[in-house]
Curated annotation (Swiss-Prot):
Belongs to the bacterial ribosomal protein bL35 family. NCBIfam families: rpmI_bact. This is Large ribosomal subunit protein bL35. Keywords: Ribonucleoprotein, Ribosomal protein. GO terms for cellular component: cytosolic large ribosomal subunit. The keyword Cell inner membrane does not apply. It comes from Rubrobacter xylanophilus (strain DSM 9941 / JCM 11954 / NBRC 16129 / PRD-1). It comes from the Bacteria. InterPro entries: Ribosomal_bL35 (IPR001706), Ribosomal_bL35-like (IPR021137), Ribosomal_bL35_sf (IPR037229).
Length: 65
């Protein structure tokens, strides 16, 4: 059976932490920022974790257990 390939798009977006959690950035903080409030931009700037319902799919893309 051939090796599993890492999905490079997912590899750039997610990071596996030491405890096994998957970290991601929040969407909506790249452009069109002028109309967004400072409070909203601060909130969007923080990192968060992948929802447990999506973890299995993301792990498969990354090729990690």
């Amino acid at each position: 059976m051939p090796k599993m390939k890492t999905h490079k798009g997912a590899a750039g977006r997610f990071e596996v932490m030491k405890r096994g959690k998957l970290r991601r950035r929040r969407a909506g903080h790249n452009h069109i920022l002028e109309k967004k409030t400072s409070k909203r931009k601060r909130r969007l700037n923080t990192e968060t974790y992948v929802n447990p319902a999506d973890e299995k799919r993301v792990r498969r893309l990354l090729g990690v257990r």
